[in-house]
A protein has these predicted regions:
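N-terminal leader/targeting and assembly helices and adjacent pre-domain segments
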Residues: 1-162
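Acidic, glycine-rich two-metal-ion catalytic cores of nucleic acid-processing enzymes
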Residues: 154-239
């Protein structure tokens, strides 16, 4: 029999995970905006790229580790470390983070260069950065520079199904890693405490075929557990 207390605890843990993802994005936003402004001041691309990569890695690891404060078990730190340093779909978190941060720097350099072509003042460039750092290549200033100054650049593409927006790639990578870390720690905590399996419950009425496919049956330990995607708010009741 599933109790109200079990449901309450499962929902609270999911909310803590979602809050960790939300808080991480706020911090990542500040890091990226600061980095873009540094590029406009002439700080080297390589230095900025390495700095933001390190900062975002620290932010992501910090929020992932917060999961252990809610679900403590003997091998928690070891399990989390292995996950954070592990290869998932061909790359580690840090591999992807480094790649996406380099893309962000390259995108911002294009936007800043367009501003220079238009002879924008430093204050105007700063304003453009504030308004466009989340999707710099769609900044109106680029189209203006192309039209008025014959400005050219090679628009990057990364393949079907992959975002071309570096900001989105960075934040998705960070938030998905945090979400997966919370899910792993939660699952392993109950496994260590003798759980035989779990039921999945929807935490939202939003239509989602992936989430819905896991509802209504008992899952044995070792089967997929929530979160099932980056914005998943499903929760599991372990028995």
């Amino acid at each position: 029999m599933i109790t109200h207390q079990q449901i309450k605890e499962a929902k609270e843990y999911t909310l803590k995970r979602v809050q960790a993802q939300h808080n991480s994005r706020s911090k990542v936003d500040k890091v990226l905006l600061t980095a873009a402004l540094q590029l406009a001041r002439g700080i080297s691309e390589d230095k900025v790229s390495k700095s933001i990569s390190n900062q975002i890695s620290d932010i992501t690891n910090g929020y992932a580790e917060a999961s252990l404060s809610f679900r403590k078990y003997d091998d928690g730190e070891k399990d989390l470390k292995e996950y954070m340093e592990g290869v998932h779909y061909g790359k580690t978190f840090d591999n992807r983070n480094d790649e996406y941060c380099k893309r962000f720097v390259a995108d911002m350099i294009i936007t800043i260069s367009a501003c220079r072509e238009l002879s924008y003042s430093e204050s105007e460039i700063k304003s453009v950065i504030h308004s466009s750092f989340k999707d710099p290549l769609k900044s109106p200033v680029i189209q203006k520079a192309i039209k008025e100054e014959q400005f050219t650049f090679n628009k990057p593409t990364y393949g079907i199904g992959r975002t071309n927006v570096s900001y989105t790639a960075i934040t998705n990578n960070s938030e998905n890693t945090i979400a997966s870390a919370f899910g792993l720690v939660n699952n392993n905590f109950y496994d260590a405490n003798g759980a035989k399996g779990f039921y999945v419950y929807r935490g939202s009425s939003y239509p989602c075929a992936e989430c819905q496919s896991h509802v209504g049956r008992f899952h044995k330990m070792g089967e997929d557990y929530p979160p099932f995607h980056n914005h998943c708010v499903c929760y599991a009741i372990y028995l």
